[in-house]
Regions:
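Polytopic transmembrane helical bundles with strong interfacial aromatic enrichment
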Residues: 1-340
Length: 340
C-alpha cells in the first residue's frame, strides 16, 4: 500500500505481523528450551526471565536491520546519484536512529543478564553491573556490540553530509562486526567442538543478517522505486542465494555439534525428544519455506520485473519477511539455550 501524501509505503500491518511472529517464535522457543533451576540456586525474578529473550530479540532485530541498511548502497552501486540519493538519505536517517536504538537495547540486555545472576534482580548496584561487564565474557561482548552500534549511527550521520562521506562498505562491516561478539559468547562457546561451533555460528549469523536485512531494505525502500528495483533485485537475488547456502550449511554444522555434545542421549533422541531439537527442526522447516519462496521470486517473478511487467513482488517479499521474523524469534531464544 502506498501513501501518496508521504510518497512512502505504509508498512504498519506488515511490520506488526513480523513483530508478532518474532515474539511468538522467541516465546515458544524460550518455553521449549527452558531448564529447571538447580537446587540451592536462587531463581531469577520473573521480570528478568521475561526481559532476557525480549531484549535479545530486540538486539538481534536492530543488528540485522543495521546490516541491511549497510547493504543497500552496495545494491545500488553504479546508478546515477540523482536516482539513488533520495532512497539513500532515507536509509541513512533510519540507520542513524537504529544505531542508537541498537546500542540502548545492548545496554539493557547487559543490565538484564547481570540481573539474572544478582540476588536482587534488576535492583543490582552499579558496582555489580560494572563487575559483570568487565569480568564476564557475555558482558564484554555486549559492550563491543553497543560500541559498534554507536559507530554505525555515526557513519550514517556522516553519510548524510554532502561531502566527506565514509566508504560505502564501512557501515555494513561495522554492523557485522557488532554481531560477532554475541555469536562467540553464546552456547556455541561451550560446545565440545567449540572451534567448529564458533566458526559455523559466526558464518550463520553474518549470512542470515545480510539475507534478512537485505530483503527488508529491498522491500521497504527499493520496491516503491521500481526503476531502482530492476537493478537491485537481481543483485540481491545473487547475494540471497549465497547467504541461503551459507545459512543452511553453517546451521547444519552447528546443529550437529550441539546435538552430538551429549553422547549419553544420542543425536537422534536429542533432535526428536528435547525442546532444543524441536526448535532446530522448526528453524529448518522455516528455512525450507524461505528457500521455496526465494526460488519462486528468483525464477518466476524476477524475469517479469526485468521486463517491467506488473507482478506482486511486494506480496512475495512480504511473505518471506514474515517467515524470517519467526525464524529470528526462534534464533534469539536458541542463542541463549543449550541442549538439556
Amino acid at each position: 500500500v502506498i501513501d501518496r501524501r508521504a510518497g512512502l509505503p505504509h508498512w504498519s500491518p506488515l511490520l506488526f505481523g513480523v513483530v508478532v511472529l518474532a515474539g511468538v517464535g522467541v516465546t515458544a522457543a524460550s518455553v521449549l528450551t527452558s531448564v529447571p533451576v538447580a537446587p540451592g540456586v536462587p531463581a531469577p525474578p520473573g521480570s528478568v526471565r521475561f526481559a532476557l529473550p525480549a531484549l535479545r530479540l530486540a538486539v538481534d532485530a536492530c543488528s540485522v536491520a543495521s546490516v541491511g541498511l549497510g547493504v543497500l548502497p552496495l545494491l545500488l552501486r553504479g546508478l546515477r546519484p540523482n536516482r539513488t540519493r533520495p532512497v539513500l538519505v532515507r536509509a541513512h536517517k533510519l540507520g542513524l536512529g537504529l544505531g542508537a536504538v541498537w546500542a540502548l537495547a545492548a545496554l539493557l540486555l547487559l543490565w538484564a543478564q547481570a540481573a539474572e545472576l544478582a540476588p536482587s534482580g534488576f535492583g543490582l548496584g552499579t558496582a555489580e553491573l560494572a563487575r559483570y561487564a568487565a569480568e564476564v565474557g557475555a558482558g564484554r561482548a555486549l559492550l563491543v556490540a553497543g560500541a559498534c552500534a554507536l559507530a554505525t549511527a555515526v557513519l550514517h550521520a556522516a553519510s548524510l553530509r554532502p561531502h566527506a562521506r565514509p566508504p560505502e562498505e564501512l557501515p555494513v562491516l561495522v554492523a557485522l562486526l557488532g554481531q560477532l561478539p554475541l555469536a562467540l559468547t553464546g552456547h556455541s562457546a561451550a560446545a565440545a567442538n567449540h572451534e567448529l561451533a564458533l566458526l559455523s555460528m559466526s558464518v550463520h549469523v553474518m549470512a542470515a543478517s545480510a539475507w534478512v536485512g537485505g530483503l527488508g531494505v529491498l522491500l521497504f525502500l527499493v520496491v516503491p522505486e521500481r526503476s531502482l528495483l530492476v537493478t537491485a533485485l537481481p543483485r540481491f537475488a545473487a547475494v540471497g542465494t549465497v547467504c541461503l547456502c551459507a545459512v543452511a550449511v553453517s546451521g547444519v554444522v552447528n546443529a550437529v555439534v550441539q546435538l552430538t555434545g551429549r553422547p549419553e542421549i544420542g543425536w537422534a533422541a536429542a533432535l526428536l525428544s528435547t525442546g532444543y531439537g524441536w526448535v532446530v527442526l522448526t528453524k529448518t522447516a522455516a528455512l525450507g519455506v524461505l528457500a521455496g519462496l526465494g526460488g519462486w521470486l528468483r525464477f518466476r517473478l524476477m524475469p517479469a520485473v526485468l521486463r517491467h511487467r506488473a507482478v506482486p513482488v511486494t506480496l512475495w517479499l512480504g511473505l518471506e519477511l514474515l517467515v524470517m521474523g519467526l525464524a529470528i524469534g526462534l534464533a534469539a531464544a536458541l542463542a541463549r539455550a543449550s541442549l538439556s
